[in-house]
Regions:
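A generic structural signal for short, non-catalytic loop/turn and secondary-structure boundary residues
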Residues: 2, 45-47, 111-113, 160, ...
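Ordered, small/hydrophobic-rich secondary-structure cores
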Residues: 1-97, 178-180
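Structured core of small recognition/catalytic domains
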Residues: 131-220
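Short, well-ordered turn and helix-capping elements at secondary-structure junctions
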Residues: 11, 54-58, 124-126, 165-171
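HotDog/MaoC-like acyl-thioester-processing domains
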Residues: 54-64, 70-118, 173-175, 186-241
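Residues that recognize and position ribonucleotide moieties
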Residues: 18, 45, 131, 160, ...
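Catalytic strand-loop segment that frames the active site of acyl-thioester-processing enzymes
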Residues: 1-35, 39, 103-154
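Preference for bulky hydrophobic residues occupying beta-strand positions
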Residues: 7-9, 27, 52, 69, ...
């Protein structure tokens, strides 16, 4: 089944560049999932994993953006795009959402190699109707930690963009005044590097993420190689594996 949903945009969805914030994309995907579940007459299920590829920036406008959803067993394949009258299409996001199948999650212990420690303050609006942190809000907590960690490793303020985000939701996250995120640097490529993180509470992992960042040349509008200086800043924080 293929479902198409016209998702309204909000000014609050924008980032400092007037592009849709990465977490807002996840909100659009959720709106489309709920619309699909209602139309198909199936129960909306929580996510266990979400992988997002960011293909192009989306700027604010009053018209909605289209979200298509295709079902593959317990996986929803989704795409956020515009289709024009001349037949051309601009794809902004491609995503794969794995839905919970009812099996209890396997416990996951914190990775001691992730030596970055980032406290993130909670807010009441982070909570869902069940009293736990909403899954999209979980992405926002991880995003806050990622931005803070970029400062720790000396990458804050440099021209980077996130091109891929992988998040695993291990267990429901209870309300806390402050959440602990452990972070480190994953693979370093020619023009990219990874930030890996775990959202931890009481020696348990509640969510984990891996984000691929690329160096970006804003004048040329394309990826750029990492400089020797940037590699020198990142390499001490690389985690094994």
């Amino acid at each position: 089944m293929r479902h198409t949903y016209a998702c309204a945009m909000r000014w609050a969805d924008m980032d400092a560049l007037n592009h849709v914030n990465n977490v807002a994309y996840a909100d659009y995907l959720r709106e489309a999932r709920l619309a699909y579940a209602e139309e198909a007459g199936v129960r909306a299920r929580p996510m266990t994993a979400l992988a997002i590829d960011y293909r192009a920036p989306l700027v604010f406008r009053p018209e909605p953006v289209l979200v298509t959803t295709t079902v593959e067993d317990d996986v929803l394949v989704q795409e956020i795009s515009d289709r024009r009258e001349d037949g051309t299409t601009t794809v902004y996001v491609q995503a794969r959402t794995t839905l919970a199948d009812g099996a209890p999650p396997a416990p996951l212990r914190p990775d001691e190699a992730l030596t970055g420690r980032l406290p993130v303050a909670g807010r009441a609006r982070d909570l869902g109707v069940d009293g736990d942190v909403d899954q999209v809000a979980t992405l926002e907590l991880l995003q806050e930690a990622r931005v803070a960690y970029a400062t720790v490793v000396g990458a804050r303020g440099l021209p980077w963009v996130v091109v891929r985000s992988e998040t695993t939701f291990v267990r429901p996250l209870p309300r806390r005044a402050t959440y602990a995120v452990h972070a480190g640097i994953g693979k370093i490529g020619r023009s990219s590097f990874e930030i890996v993180a775990q959202l931890v509470d009481d020696a348990q992992v509640f969510a984990s993420s891996r984000n691929v960042m690329i160096g970006f040349d804003p004048e040329a509008g394309r990826a750029r190689p990492l400089t020797d200086g940037e590699r020198t800043q990142l390499e001490p924080h690389v985690v094994a594996g």
